[in-house]
Amino acid sequence: MLGNVKKTLFGVLCLGTLCLRGLMAEPDAKELVNLGIESAKKQDFAQAKTHFEKACELKNGFGCVFLGAFYEEGKGVGKDLKKAIQFYTKGCELNDGYGCNLLGNLYYNGQGVSKDAKKASQYYSKACDLNHAEGCMVLGSLHHYGVGTPKDLRKALDLYEKACDLKDSPGCINAGYIYSVTKNFKEAIVRYSKACELKDGRGCYNLGVMQYNAQGTAKDEKQAVENFKKGCKSSVKEACDALKELKIEL
């Protein structure tokens, strides 16, 4: 009788396992990307590559971009810029802003492809449309200096503003700079303040200069010094020099 009980229990357990297997779904594309990131953190690049490949096959743009980065940097695979470009392109086509931005970098610098500032600007433009902050900032710089696209200060400012809104501190600083040279000091202060809040020492230094010189605000030497200190702690040489000139120790 005991033998029959054991057989019954075993049968139930087997049935439970079969049911469990049936309920356990394969990881979806997003989960595969997360698994890939975890494997990469553990320096298991071969396993990470496998996860990213599967995610990319499932049309996850971020997975394709990670795979491209592995080929660009030679992690878990031989370094291969052509393959990197192939996967960045697929990521960009799948509307991943990082992929578009990285493609822009490669075309701008002529890495793995012929140098082409115009094509780079097109990829940066798509990256920006997809709300990739760095893409907006770099595209703004291209318009600012007329590289690969007509020079357009108004367009540059709009792009810097968008980058700043997306919490890109260089975008805030560049927007602040344009406002400064056009004597719109109050707007410059707003942008430099945001850059400083984003822990960018250059923004803190620029804000301090405006506070010290009473540009767009009442003169405030005490607050200026505090911002020079923040800048100096972030290794901004000009901020450290300002403190030395004022004979103030960090």
UniProtKB/Swiss-Prot annotation:
InterPro entries linked to this entry: HcpB-like, Sel1-like, TPR-like_helical_dom_sf, TPR_rpt
Effect ascribed to mutating residue 17 to A: In strain: ATCC 49503
Signal sequence interval, chain numbering: 1-25
Regulation: Inhibited by cloxacillin and oxacillin but not by ACA derivatives or metal chelators.
Repeat region (TPR), residues: 29-62, 67-98, 100-133, 134-169, 170-202
Effect the entry attributes to changing residue 4 to S: In strain: ATCC 49503
Effect of residue 91 to S: In strain: ATCC 49503
Effect of residue 199 to N: In strain: ATCC 49503
Principal cellular location given in the protein's record: secreted
Keyword Disulfide bond: yes
Gene Ontology biological-process annotations: response to antibiotic
Compartmental location: Secreted
Catalytic activity: a beta-lactam + H2O = a substituted beta-amino acid
Gene3D superfamilies (alphabetical): Tetratricopeptide repeat domain
Any Pfam family the entry gives: TPR_8
E.C. designation(s): 3.5.2.6
Disulfide pairings: 56-64, 92-100, 128-136, 164-172, 196-204, 232-240
GO cellular component, one term: extracellular region
Family: Belongs to the hcp beta-lactamase family.
Binding partners and assembly: Monomer.
Function: Slowly hydrolyzes 6-aminopenicillinic acid and 7-aminocephalosporanic acid (ACA) derivatives. May be involved in the synthesis of the cell wall peptidoglycan.
Miscellaneous remark of the record: Antibodies against HcpA are present in sera from human patients infected by Helicobacter pylori.
Identification of the protein by name: Beta-lactamase HcpA
Organism of provenance: Helicobacter pylori (strain ATCC 700392 / 26695)
Lineage: Bacteria, Pseudomonadati, Campylobacterota, Epsilonproteobacteria, Campylobacterales
Annotated gene: hcpA
